[in-house]
Amino acid sequence: MTITPLNPTSTQQPDSLGRFGKFGGKYVPETLMPALLQLETACKKYSQDPTFKQELQQLLRDYVGRPSPLYFAERLTAHYTKPDGTGPQIYLKREDLNHTGAHKINNALGQALLAQRMGKQRIIAETGAGQHGVATATVCARFGLKCVIYMGIHDMERQALNVFRMRLMGAEVRPVEAGTGTLKDATSEAIRDWVTNVETTHYILGSVAGPHPYPMMVRDFHAVIGVETRAQCLEKWNGLPDILMACVGGGSNAMGLFHEFINDPSVRMIGVEAAGKGVDTNKHAATLTLGRVGVLHGAMSYLLQDEEGQIIEPHSISAGLDYPGVGPEHSFLKDSGRVEYYSVTDNEAVAAFQRLSQLEGIIPALETAHAIAYLETLCPQLSGSPRIVFNCSGRGDKDVQTVGKFLEG
């Protein structure tokens, strides 16, 4: 088996201050600046280091199971075929088949290798759906690193399976009761820990959020998704996809897919957020749809906030999308018009969760189901037979109980 090289063709980077336009930056306590500078230096050094790249590629192949397949969803395609025989050809980038069941392992693995080279033996991370926590616990077990995971108490209840998996692999899972006990609160606690233990500890942030260099670094570790997708599309039909789709919470799986194609104007890109109980309610997580610019967790981006600038607590049936911010590069791509962002409700996501399960025998993560759900709106608008690739970012074993309770009423 050959492994796809990890060199994305897109040249877009943040500037020297870590900004994408006006978004991004480093809004952090002074105590964290040395750690961020050390991390930035390590990123620059090892991204060009042949030994590091070879080790990462070998682990992605032999441990993670890359490349992940690009699967033609025949029955889902038939579901959206019009009476005249036209309709989109739908392909799934199967990140759910990675070791640990989601895209999160790509980034966790890369950061663990960096942490080793920086001499950090203690790892902390935040998690919402539990997939990033599981991926982090996995790589810490693989490399013999001490692991502490911060997780909101509410998320621990709805993602009990992943909590057990993390503890099984030797991680300490610390419940966070502050706020609503969800992803934002877990992230805040992880940052507090990092400030206190910065000399010995590396923070494996799980999304393209946070202060520079995290949005760039996490994107680049996930860019293998888009690099593989380009090669697989060229192999299958000797061309590029017409449309890319991915769910967006913090936005790491979407950036991993989109980044490779940013400079291909023929490729339309769509990110799908969580509308929760509806964007006309206060129970949603549609940051790019309804948010305003502010600073959270070390970066400037779109945020859900009230008139006084206080963060509004988000809501989504999906723990991984239940976040009041978004990665700064997504904010930049929204304002530049390069990527379109829409939102779907809990009800629509659950219907899509069932639809993919019944039509393809693939149970998607609830996060992924949001992207699938937008096909209901998108497909009737399309003419001809465009090729759609959507990122099947994770598997849905973790969400079966949540969906069961939701359907019971």
UniProtKB/Swiss-Prot annotation:
Q: Which cofactor does it need?
A: pyridoxal 5'-phosphate
User: What reaction gets catalysed by this protein?
Assistant: (1S,2R)-1-C-(indol-3-yl)glycerol 3-phosphate + L-serine = D-glyceraldehyde 3-phosphate + L-tryptophan + H2O
Any single GO CC term annotated in Swiss-Prot or TrEMBL for this entry = cytoplasm
Taxonomically, which superkingdom?
Answer: Bacteria
What does the UniProt keyword field contain? Answer: Amino-acid biosynthesis, Aromatic amino acid biosynthesis, Lyase, Pyridoxal phosphate, Tryptophan biosynthesis
Q: What InterPro entries does the record tag this protein with? A: Trp_synth_b_CS, Trp_synth_beta, Trp_synth_beta/beta-like, TrpB-like_PALP, TrpB-like_PALP_sf
- EC number(s) in its UniProt entry? 4.2.1.20
| Pathway of action | Amino-acid biosynthesis; L-tryptophan biosynthesis; L-tryptophan from chorismate: step 5/5
Give any GO molecular function from the UniProt entry: tryptophan synthase activity
For this protein, the record's Pfam families field holds: PALP (PF00291)
Q: Which Gene3D superfamilies match?
A: 3.40.50.1100
Q: Which residues does this entry mark as bearing N6-(pyridoxal phosphate)lysine? A: K104
Q: Which SUPFAM superfamilies does the UniProt record give?
A: Tryptophan synthase beta subunit-like PLP-dependent enzymes
Quaternary structure and partners: Tetramer of two alpha and two beta chains.
The similarity comment for this entry is: Belongs to the TrpB family.
Record's function text: The beta subunit is responsible for the synthesis of L-tryptophan from indole and L-serine.
> Per its record, how is this protein called by name?
Tryptophan synthase beta chain
Biological source species: Trichodesmium erythraeum (strain IMS101)
Q: What is the lineage of its organism?
A: Bacteria, Bacillati, Cyanobacteriota, Cyanophyceae, Oscillatoriophycideae
UniProt lists the gene as trpB
